[in-house]
Amino acid sequence: MNRNLTICFTSDIHGYFSDMDYATGTPGTTGLSRCASSFPHDGNTLILDGGDILQGSPFAYWLSREPVEGAKVSAQVMNLAGYHFVTIGNHDFNLGRETLESYLSHLDARCVSANVEGASGVERTAVVTLENGLRVGITGVTTHFVNLWEKPENLVGIKVHEAFPAAAAALEEL
């Protein structure tokens, strides 16, 4: 039996959900909508994101005026794109824990990060069985430099451990 796996991976979307170039008012060449339309939605494809969703674009800035509600909108967009798994990027902490957890709680996708502890909705690892019977282990890591870069008040109750040892431990679990 042929057991193929297709992985579609994005990272650093930074709220660029549309391909609209806001400066010119014309379609641009980037944005989640440009690549998400080509994602296969079958039982042997995993759609993954490496984080940095909540901050960066003019639209993300507009959403950040009401960050908890804005995070729900970002999650809805990711849901429409059909993501299965995401991890947390360093900029996903920028709007605080409540905003991050709002985003994660409204996702259809599961969030995996082997080195983030204390945030609701984060799993260390996951295993899925594809339609063709292939079992796939999934994990992610978040840069531990978040501990240096992020405002301490945005990390209250959250620990971001060293990435490489956490990834090695997750691999052993899988």
What do the PLM-derived regions correspond to, one by one?
Residues 1-174:
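Acidic, metal/ion-coordinating pockets
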